[in-house]
Amino acid sequence: MLKIGVMLSIILVLFPLATLQLVAERPAAERYAENKQDLNPDERRNYLVDLGVERTCCTACNIPPCKCCA
């Protein structure tokens, strides 16, 4: 009976606690991007630049009012 109680406590308490990913363990860039996912595309592009994600530009967008290469 004691073995069953130990197994139940491990399964019901310790296992779920071990599988939880704490917020402090997640990379800061991931948390930052997750918080900004509902922004419009222009704001999202600016946050990607802030996170260090490099974007390449097509040659057809070299016109000054182009927003994808700004």
UniProtKB/Swiss-Prot annotation:
The keyword Secreted applies. The cysteine framework is III (CC-C-C-CC). Classified in the M-1 branch, since 1 residue stands between the fourth and the fifth cysteine residues. It comes from Conus bayani (Bayan's cone). Keywords: Secreted, Signal, Toxin. GO terms for cellular component: extracellular region. Expressed by the venom duct. This is Conotoxin ba3a. Residues 1-20 form the signal peptide. One of its GO terms (molecular function) is toxin activity. It is found in: Secreted. InterPro entries: Conotoxin (IPR004214). It comes from the Eukaryota.
